[in-house]
Amino acid sequence: MAKEIHHPDRAQIDLSAVLEALSEPTRRDIVLRLVEEGEAACMAFDECGPKTNLSYHFARLREAGVTRVRLEGPYRKISLRTEDLAARFPGLLEAIVAAARAADKSPGGKAPVLAAD
């Protein structure tokens, strides 16, 4: 019998948990790839780091309500919960993705810091 994978219900998705999950660069990279490519097998992210580290990052994203993991035979498929996130926090995922892409294009790979007036 397959182990059931727990996901928070839409109403249980917490803004602080989502922001904390997306504050880590590896998890942001996973989300950016899912935005670009759609659902993927967890093993498709092997170049992002060791399997134990990736398992931890996948769990943090799932527990925060950012992703959904489903079993397909021996594989785990991961996808973004775009509809749930948009319903709870309209525009949040799009803003985070846009900021992450802008950061990737800036010198040093970090988001530009605006000078205070």
For the regions a protein language model found, what residue spans apply to each?
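N-terminal helix-turn-helix DNA-binding core of bacterial DNA-binding proteins
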Residues: 14-53, 72-84
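Short beta-strand "wing" residues that participate in macromolecule-binding interfaces
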Residues: 68-69
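Glycine-centered, phosphate/nucleic-acid-interacting loop/turn motifs that mediate DNA/RNA or nucleotide
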Residues: 65
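Short, hydrophobic-biased segments on the C-terminal half of alpha helices
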Residues: 58-59
